[in-house]
Amino acid sequence: MSQYGLTVAQQFGTSLPEYSSVGEAERNLYRERDDALQEISLHLGETLRLDYSAESLKRLERWYFENGCPQNFNSGGAVAAAMGFYFGETLRRSAQFAWIVKEFAFAKGHYEIGVSRAPLPPVSM
């Protein structure tokens, strides 16, 4: 990685939430995920038939752009963050992904949440 890339990664890392342990990070970030999923379901679930299918992702994206890329729901929750969590949960439910929380490699004590494909089981021959 170039020096510039390292600097950018470190700056980004400091923008991530800071926790004293992975356990604390998991509790808080999973709660944030759950709250965002509840909020997107409450505001758009029925209207867009959000059922965690690939087609529902298309409906959600269309709604987002047709409504001028809204920043927040009326309740104040961030739309883009909720959409990201919805995408991750769709992957988890349909494509063998799992939620993970990990410390960011370039900023000690700062954590990120995301999804990762679960390893495939060994193939018997």
What name fits each language-model region?
Residues M1-F85, T90-S94, A98-M125:
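Intrinsic low-complexity, intrinsically disordered or marginally ordered coil/linker segments
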